[in-house]
A protein has these predicted regions:
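Core segments of cupin and vicinal oxygen chelate
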Residues: 31-87, 126, 133, 145, ...
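Vicinal oxygen chelate
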Residues: 1-21, 30, 53, 90, ...
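Long, charged/polar, surface-exposed segments that mediate recognition or autoinhibition
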Residues: 105-110
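Protein kinase-like catalytic core scaffold
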Residues: 88-91, 113
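Short, solvent-exposed beta-strand edge segments and adjacent coil->beta transition regions
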Residues: 23-27, 111-116
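A short acidic, glycine-rich active-site loop
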Residues: 76, 116-118
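Short, solvent-exposed aromatic-acidic interface loops
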Residues: 95-98
Length: 179
């Protein structure tokens, strides 16, 4: 169930900072029916590194963390990402005792909730061609150029939507490519 929030204040974009609340992004969780198969896809097709191989999490600690969210939160989980990205990783989760569903088949990119995961590459043409050779399904027919950022969209075998981003100015964050 979604909550509501209203501060009654306008939101400033640049220069605003709320102290001691959020200090960084931790990870993006991806729920899959087979953790090992998903790790193979992210490693062999996308080239991500396995930073923590699949392991089973169960018992009181995980029940205390997630027991109100999932009837039996026992899971097999792994972490994939890039070695120098710190906490910016994908947490790959397979719930072992609760059957999930393919909600993505009925979802649209514009639905509320998690929309997509952004990945950066140095050569979008070469990366897209390589992923197409590996059988990745792209959602758009080509490559767009928007605000000095080149993009293309694809989906993984479990319906998670990804955007590939090539920055024109690698030294800047992707959202600060324009002047």
């Amino acid at each position: 169930m979604a909550g509501t929030y209203s501060s009654g204040a306008s939101i400033g974009i640049r220069g605003s900072k709320v102290e001691n609340v959020i200090t960084g992004l931790a990870h993006t969780g991806v729920c899959v029916p087979d953790c090992a198969a998903a790790v193979e896809f992210y490693r062999d097709v996308l080239g991500l590194r396995v930073l923590s191989p699949p392991y089973v999490m169960g018992g009181n600690a995980i029940r205390n963390d997630m027991g109100e969210l999932v009837p039996d939160p026992t899971m097999k989980a792994a972490i994939v990402g890039l070695p120098d990205d710190g906490d910016h990783v994908l947490e790959v989760i397979e719930y072992l005792n609760v059957h999930g569903g393919d909600q993505r088949s009925a979802a649209a990119l514009t639905d509320y909730g998690l929309s997509h995961v952004g990945l950066i590459c140095e050569d979008l043409d070469a990366t897209r061609a390589e992923l197409e050779r590996k059988g990745v399904q792209f959602l758009v027919s080509g490559i767009a150029d928007v605000a000095r950022v080149r993009t293309t969209w694809f989906v993984d075998p479990w319906g998670v939507v990804f955007i590939l981003v090539e920055k024109s100015r690698p030294e800047r964050p992707y959202f600060c490519q324009w002047d």
